[in-house]
Structure formats: C-alpha cells, structure tokens
Curated annotation (Swiss-Prot):
Organism superkingdom: Bacteria
Highest classification ranks of the organism: Bacteria, Bacillati, Bacillota, Bacilli, Lactobacillales
InterPro entries the record matches: PRibTrfase_dom, PRTase-like, Pur/Pyrimidine_PRTase, Xanthine_PRibTrfase
Pathway assignment: Purine metabolism; XMP biosynthesis via salvage pathway; XMP from xanthine: step 1/1
Protein name (record): Xanthine phosphoribosyltransferase
Binding of xanthine, residues: 20, 27, 156
Record text on subunit structure and interactions: Homodimer.
Gene name of the encoded protein: xpt
Amino acid sequence: MKLLEDKIKSEGIVLPNNVLKVDGFLNHQVDAQLMFEIGKEFGRLFKKQNVTKILTVESSGIAPAVMTGLAMDVPVVFARKHKSLTLTDDLYTASVYSYTKQTSNQISISKRFIDEKDRVLIIDDFLANGQAVSGLLDIADAANIDVVGVGIVIEKTFQKGSQIIKDRDIQLESLARIKALTDDGQVEFE
C-alpha cells in the first residue's frame, strides 16, 4: 500500500535491534485518515472470506481493526492484556511475548464475544516474530473458531512471524512488507 509506505518513509524512525518506531501515526498518535484507508484496503482484500468478527490485541491493533470492522460491517473484539474488574473468569487466554517491551502478557477474550460459528479475521499493527498472532490463533483454537485471514499493517519479512500463518494455510495480507531496516536508518520495502 503506497500511502502507508510513504508514511513509513516520511515518519518512521529506525531504532537499534530492528525496531521501527511509528508512534506518530500508528501506535501512539493515530492518523485517522490513514487508518480509514487501511480499513478499506483490508475490507477489499478479505471481502470473499465472509468474516463475522475481527480479533486483535490491545492497544495498537485496535485502530486498524476498528476501521476494518467499519469497512466490513462486523464487530471487533480485542484481547485484553491486563485483567480488570469487568473481565469475568469465563475467558479464553494465551501467553504472548512482546519483543519491543521485553515482557510477557496473558491476553484474554471473554467467551461471550466469540463462538464456534464465527469466521474470524485477525488484524494487527506489526508482524515480526508472530507472538501476538500466535496468541490469537491459540485463543481461536480453544474457542474452536475458524480463522479465515490475518491482516497486518506492517510486516518485517526478514523475521519469521509469517511462517506461523503459512504453516496453517491462512490467508495473510500485509499492507507494508519490510525486507530490511538498515544501520543508517533506512527502511527497505519488498
């Protein structure tokens, strides 16, 4: 998606250890118009999958997931990273490691919001090592729901995350595919 690649080139910051900082438009401040276009594109790419729900992980996946839900006219359910008083014990859970935060989180989704009749599309901001997607796939397996696709805003193709999805023969669509983050701060796209 050229619009997204241009935004990454102009505002993304390459940090050490293959980290791409995009907090100016995706995961701190959100460019709503860009998210709207991202949602429309995911809606187009997964149109034939008869999606009934979208799953994501809080918090950076929420903006693109909501815009995709709007484009597809389906609800969005996000996995919570922290248990709150409003979350009951009737939950699907999975453990997810965050490379950028160097922590593990127990993600949870209430059993009230997903069931085995659902055809789920997973949307997330980044795909690198595949931990967040893997956690959502674990929850989908526990709920016995059909995952019909995974939509990623930014994929680091030089890391192994996509293999988890390919091994399960799930449609994967990444709007920006990065093949390298260079030492001099450049982003190289496929």
